[in-house]
Regions:
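Conserved active-site tyrosine of GNAT-family acetyltransferases
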Residues: 57-62, 141, 241-248, 331
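Well-ordered, non-membrane alpha-helical segments in soluble/globular domains
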Residues: 54-57, 237-241, 300, 325, ...
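Active-site-proximal structural scaffolding
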Residues: 54, 120, 221, 237, ...
Length: 333
């Protein structure tokens, strides 16, 4: 257990006086309202794919890592797939709109940016954390100006259920945070009671992908999720971190400059898990200078370019890998 009152963050990235003032205050308020007691580890990560893409995506996951589908349900607007790896690791929930014409907040945000318009319904949604009571979490966070989805607010009712609640999309990251107070493996307890099965051809496609992983000798080498990294604008780095730490029981582990990219990597982690794969780190990456300043010195700005082209959003999900030798080649250097 890390003592957040005395912990000194790591790294060479300097933070502002504003950040240094409010970080301990965020920690203190979490304790005062009971958030650190009522919210636990990450239970799931949620991704929406375009209509018709879920099977191909799950096949891709079956080749690349340990996640396999264990349940599939229907909501009024989506097919909902539950994927598991190890019992102690977060689940992966894949949402697929039932209609190619489906439109919601994700569609509208994606259409604002030039390179995300090609797949307007594809987006990383956010993380779901286990809690003792979703109602208690709302009661604790709403006075802090954290906005939650209520019935009728969104086209997709997955974001507002009796035992599952989500925040609105963050103004800084365009991600959500969700909370669940029942077993995440029990989709029926979430009100998703209508089961469906994939066609034999779709099941065969996913099975063949899993077999390919074994044939190539990489099964067992890719472990659970290590971290997920959101790219944000240069001027919103500290705000995004403080907002996230307001909503979840994580801590600011540290931040490092990446001089070659003119950016920084900022890491938040869960203070009590003995393995990050049980509650993966949440990383925020931002340029050190905004786009309109970079041209003075022709500085690199891949992170800023990404955000300007795709919007604030998740950039990658990184899996931990097992060290070892395969086919005479070392797997990890």
């Amino acid at each position: 257990m890390i003592d957040l009152s005395t912990y000194q963050s790591l790294g060479d990235k300097k933070n502002s006086d504003f950040f240094q003032e409010f970080l301990p205050r965020v920690y203190e308020r979490r304790v005062a309202v009971g958030l650190d007691e009522m919210v636990g580890a990450m239970a799931a990560v949620v991704i929406q794919v375009a209509h018709g893409d879920a099977v191909n995506y799950m096949a891709e996951l079956a080749v690349m890592g340990p996640y396999r589908m264990t349940d599939s349900r229907l909501s009024e607007t989506h097919r909902v797939f539950l994927l598991c790896s190890e019992p102690d690791f977060p689940r992966l929930i894949v949402l697929e709109p039932l209609s190619p014409a489906y439109t919601d907040e994700i569609t509208r945000w994606n259409n604002l940016y030039p390179l995300s318009r090609a797949n307007p319904n594809a987006r990383y949604i956010g993380e779901v954390y286990s809690t003792k009571s979703v109602a208690a979490v709302r009661d604790a966070l709403e006075p802090q100006n954290i906005r939650f989805v209520y019935p009728g607010d969104q086209e997709n009712d997955f974001f507002c259920r009796e035992h599952l609640t989500f925040t609105f999309m963050s103004d800084f990251t365009y991600n959500r945070v969700g909370y669940v107070d029942v077993d995440i493996d029990d989709l029926g307890a979430l009100g998703l009671t209508e089961r469906f099965t994939l066609s034999p051809d779709d099941e065969a496609k996913i099975s063949r992908a899993a077999e390919l992983q074994a044939e190539r000798g990489i099964d067992g080498l890719v472990l659970g999720l290590d971290h997920m990294a959101t790219r944000i604008l240069a001027g919103e780095r500290e705000d995004a971190i403080l907002e996230y730490l307001t909503m979840v029981p994580y801590y600011f582990w540290g931040a490092y400059n990446i001089s070659e990219m003119n950016s920084s990597t900022n890491v938040t982690r869960h203070p009590t898990v003995d393995d990050d794969k049980k509650s993966p780190a949440r990383v925020f990456t931002a340029n050190n200078t905004p786009s309109f300043v970079n041209s003075f010195d022709n500085l690199p700005m891949p992170t800023e370019d990404f955000v300007r082209n795709f919007g604030r959003r998740m950039h990658h999900m990184a899996f931990a890998v097992q060290d070892g030798h395969v086919a005479t080649e070392k797997n990890v250097d």
